[in-house]
């Protein structure tokens, strides 16, 4: 679009423009930026009371201050034994599938794993999806359905009110993903509240308590009303969706890209083998986070396949703004695409090519300012540190333990469509050839 019109700024709607300029993006999304989130967009996403959809700056600051202690680096580090256990369980289940001569649908296992993790952080218990026997757990289907319908919500914001007002028997047929996701979040919140009322400890694995603990027990220095159940339910839906899809998508993509590039697989395998005692024997997430080539693979995957590829809308403030010679009056919706920033050839040579080495050279520091997979500023992804720990742990264990190959998966299968989060056109499958830790070899599906 920008190439067609030979302009960094293009009008995409009656009151909306898209700007493809990383420098403008930096100003728009800076912590002290006067550009607020677009009310039209964020009020339509179906979870209006969740942190990601709060538009009032003061209320957002309060909510982020309440939740941030549960996602600090030291908290996530203390959770690493539990994360390691969940990832190892996922690897064991995948190995069991291979033992039955079955291929592995990576979406099924990566999403199940990330839902289990975020369920532990939100409700105080993993959701148990990895160990479900269904070919695709119902909750994962709900998440996929919800994502598929996202553009309807975006363009018709009244749908949210309508879906919650009409009988469930109708709304469940019309918007099954959203309705069933909300029902599951409601059930989990009610179970949590009942446990609290009965005096049962909800979670003994999290240093600061669950997200619901943090919302219901604010520190004295923060003036905050007790959240209504609808707020807890919205946060539950938002954390399950945002905390599973983006992270699982990155795990899938990294697996595909490494298997698709044998030289990359060889380098990664060598690095992981040298660090095996920190992976297999005494698990050390601090050591994994320092592995240069693993880090480069993760960064390049997030650059190439930006999880939130949909343009992020902000509203021009009262005085208006001049961008590339065009005056935009107050109220204009200004959008930026993280995907386009990550694929800008002025900063990333051969931007469509998978080149982890670009993050290892002397110019890597210069690229960091254009690396924004979790956005930036005060509205950046609150769960970024947790996501990195999940991705590193998963990739380290899976590529240390298994010899794998792609199974009935083509480049066309990996093409994607924008549903705010990304939906793939096909299915990414792998075949586990051998368990390197046990020496067990598996027959082909």
Curated annotation (Swiss-Prot):
Enzyme Commission number, as recorded: 1.-.-.-
Binding site for heme: 381
Top-level taxon: Eukaryota
One BP term from GO: mycotoxin biosynthetic process
Alphabetized PANTHER family for the sequence: CYTOCHROME P450, CYTOCHROME P450 MONOOXYGENASE ASQL-RELATED
Function comment: Cytochrome P450 monooxygenase; part of the gene cluster that mediates the biosynthesis of penigequinolones, potent insecticidal alkaloids that contain a highly modified 10-carbon prenyl group. The first stage is catalyzed by the nonribosomal peptide synthetase penN that condenses anthranilic acid and O-methyl-L-tyrosine to produce 4'-methoxycyclopeptin. 4'-methoxycyclopeptin is then converted to 4'-methoxydehydrocyclopeptin by the ketoglutarate-dependent dioxygenase penM through dehydrogenation to form a double bond between C-alpha and C-beta of the O-methyltyrosine side chain.
Stated name of the protein: Cytochrome P450 monooxygenase penB
Source species of the chain: Penicillium thymicola
Gene: penB
């Amino acid at each position: 679009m920008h190439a067609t019109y030979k302009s960094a700024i293009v009008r995409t709607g009656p009151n909306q423009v898209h700007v493809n300029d990383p420098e403008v993006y930096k100003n728009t999304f800076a912590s002290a930026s006067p550009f607020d989130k677009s009310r039209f967009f964020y009020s339509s996403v179906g979870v209006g009371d969740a942190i990601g959809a709060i538009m009032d700056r003061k209320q957002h600051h309060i909510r982020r201050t309440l939740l941030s202690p549960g996602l600090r680096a030291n908290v996530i580090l203390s959770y690493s034994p539990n994360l390691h256990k969940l990832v190892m369980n996922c690897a064991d289940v995948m190995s069991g599938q291979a033992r039955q001569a079955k291929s592995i649908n990576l979406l099924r296992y990566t999403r199940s794993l990330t839902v289990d993790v975020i369920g532990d952080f939100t409700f105080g218990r993993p959701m148990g999806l990895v160990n479900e026997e269904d070919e695709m757990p119902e909750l994962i289907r709900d998440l996929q359905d919800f994502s598929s319908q996202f553009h309807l919500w975006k363009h018709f914001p009244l749908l949210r009110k309508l879906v919650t007002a009409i009988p469930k028997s109708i709304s469940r047929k019309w918007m099954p993903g959203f309705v069933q996701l909300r029902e599951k979040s409601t059930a989990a919140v009610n179970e949590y509240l009942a446990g609290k009322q009965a005096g049962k400890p909800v979670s003994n694995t999290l240093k600061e308590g669950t997200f619901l603990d943090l919302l219901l027990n604010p520190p004295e220095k923060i003036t905050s009303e007790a959240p209504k159940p609808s707020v807890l339910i919205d946060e539950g839906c938002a954390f399950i969706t945002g905390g599973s899809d983006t992270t699982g998508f990155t795990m899938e993509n990294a697996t595909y890209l490494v298997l698709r590039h044998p030289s990359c697989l060889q380098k990664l395998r060598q690095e992981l083998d040298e660090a095996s005692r920190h992976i297999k024997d005494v698990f050390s997430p601090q050591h994994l986070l320092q592995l240069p080539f693993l880090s480069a693979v993760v960064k390049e995957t997030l650059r190439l396949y930006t999880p939130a590829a949909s343009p992020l809308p902000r509203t021009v403030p009262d005085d208006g703004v001049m961008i590339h010679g065009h005056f935009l009056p107050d109220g204009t919706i200004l959008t930026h695409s993280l995907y386009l920033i990550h694929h800008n050839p002025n900063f990333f040579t051969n931007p469509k090519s998978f080149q982890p080495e670009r993050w290892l050279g002397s110019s890597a520091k210069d690229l960091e300012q254009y690396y924004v997979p979790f956005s930036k500023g005060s509205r950046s992804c609150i769960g970024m540190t947790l996501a990195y720990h999940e991705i590193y742990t998963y990739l380290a264990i899976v590529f240390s333990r298994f010899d794998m190959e792609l199974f009935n998966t083509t480049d066309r299968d990996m093409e994607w469509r924008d549903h705010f989060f990304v939906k793939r056109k096909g299915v990414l499958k792998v075949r586990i050839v051998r368990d390197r830790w046990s020496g067990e070899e598996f027959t082909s599906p």
